[in-house]
Amino acid sequence: PLVSIFRSTPLSRPISLKVMEVHPLGSQAFVPLSGRPYLVVVARPGEFCADNLRVFLAGPQQGVNYHKGCWHHYSLALDEESDFLVIDRDGPGNNCLEVFLDEEIVIDY
């Protein structure tokens, strides 16, 4: 596996999502290191459809493992920069596909 540290910088509110990503060959895990809650944005596997989008508030001790094929946004810090331990698949093939959205998706919380 690939192991890295990802730093998420908070976006201004409301958050405008412009891109989603999917890992077709393996899962991807995010483990929070900064002790802060963060947003998780996901959509069902298959062709991306904004109607399937779901947003969750993850607690400061709660990691997330995105299943192979699950559309998701990068981990979203809320009020302060937050670091995450990221575990990703290693090996041949492109395991990260992005879709740029025709219309921005706005998350106001």
Regions found by a protein language model. Name each.
Residues 57-71:
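Conserved metal-binding segment of the jelly-roll/cupin
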Residues 1-55, 79, 87-88, 92-100, ...:
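Non-catalytic, conserved peripheral segments adjacent to functional cores
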Residues 28, 64, 82:
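Residue-level detector of short, conserved catalytic/binding motifs and their immediate flanks
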Residues 69-85:
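Ligand-binding loop in jelly-roll beta-barrel domains
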